């Protein structure tokens, strides 16, 4: 799948009619530069109705779809999220709020590869949202399971504690919406930079644009204005 096409899959999910969003934001920035050596992430966030725990679980269940196949409706619970997110990054943190509850899940290829998992293991958490911006832990109810899941977050996510996880949750302003953070972005196959490392598929160096790597080089080589250089879509 073409990388910008994968990003479009995630945008389609956020703009889906049952999502109910009026605004979808796409961003790219460096995660914890002092901790993660300047690794970029891509975020997709909407102000829709959000998901409850069951719907979040269904979204992450490969092959699951509970949607009516309406014309023009790609489907939040179809294959779009899995194919789009895993095409762009090894890891995805999904955070969502709905009906007074907050939920998150980590879909991590890095974790699965590290433990040699045969099954797709996905740590999930739920909190009850209380007055004053406080969160009350809800699920998992078993303390051992909670600690085990949090250890996965601490080892394989850019958030290294429950506090940092909830700080990320607070980026969803208000009582509903969904935020997807893609990190450990995939790199170009068979191509490396001067230090022998593979390059990212995206170029984040041009203002607020997210471009395919190569668009900027094309502009410089042809001496053309940025208005006419890119042959591919540019998200702003």
Question: What are these model-derived regions, one by one?
Answer:
Residues 1-32, 84:
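Conserved ATP-binding N-box helix of the HATPase_c
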Residues 4-8, 53, 74, 78, ...:
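Amphipathic alpha-helical transducer elements in NTP-driven molecular machines
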Residues 15, 48, 80-82:
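Alpha-helical hydrophobic packing sites
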Residues 17-75, 91-93, 97-236:
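Interdomain "switch/hinge" adjacent to the Bergerat
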